[in-house]
Amino acid sequence: MNYVEIAVGSPNNRGNLVLRSELGHYLPKDGSPLYRSVYLYGDDAKEYANSHRTLKGYHGKRGIDNILIDIDRKDNSDEYTLKQLRNTLLHLNTLEVLDESIQCYFSGTGYHIVITNKVFNFQASDSLPYQVKQTMSNLFEDIDSSIYMRSGIYRVSHTKNQKTNLYKIPLTLKEALNYTYQQIHDMAKDPRFEYPYVLLDGDNELEGYICLDVPRIRQQSKVSEPTKIVPCVQTMLRNGPIQGSRHNTLLRIASYLKRNGVPS
């Protein structure tokens, strides 16, 4: 899957699929916003977009290259928002996600953390958006999961946030963990084209956390299960220990129980 959907200037200017490798060619010189899709698309989606001038109504396969965590400022203070970034980075560290697997950004108001899919190994499918949303919601408390919907997009780096007039810029982990919010804001007054990007890498560290169970649409109107355990945890308990994945399964169940207040 080699295509991403882009929107130039406004999230409303959608429906144009371009090669991911050529995304930089569409970066406006004046810093105007450029958005890209969360998901990757194949030739069938490209043909659909060409015919319909939109991806609305497309329910085929989607892939993903990076999983983005959106830490939005909302009505919070800049100090609190930066603290949330650092707490999330600490949580990733406890999950044994390596530094070389993530890239931090200041978005112009809040922060983005990009995790390479090499950490998860999500496979392309028509149910991928649901899998990503469920997986990330289970791993991270109070996460804004709306970005993982089928039509999710986000602004690319070196473009301006039109409300603050600050650029989305990449940050090193040292900067993210040690700089004040004011220092970060000062850096974001200009794009950061000179940033030394490195290719993100991973070794399936969080593959065992992926939620693969997708409820059928017709089941959504039915009465829910009497238990409040999420579907992927139900499946793990039902299947029991599986050779080669028992450690990851145990960690996932323990993490879920801890988040839901079950004492250790």
Residue ranges and their predicted role:
Residues 93-99, 138-141:
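Secondary-structure boundary elements
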Residues 1-67, 71-85, 149-153, 158-199:
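DNA replication initiation on ssDNA origins
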Residues 121-142:
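Acidic, His- and aromatic-enriched active-site or binding-groove loops in soluble protein domains
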Residues 101-108, 145-149:
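Short beta-strand
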Residues 82-97:
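Short amphipathic alpha-helix segments
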Residues 48-55, 96-100, 235-240:
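Short amphipathic beta-strand starts and helix->beta connectors
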Residues 65, 98-100, 109, 152:
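Core residues of folded domains in eukaryotic genome-function proteins
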Residues 74-78, 86-89, 109-123, 158-162, ...:
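Modules that initiate DNA replication and primer synthesis
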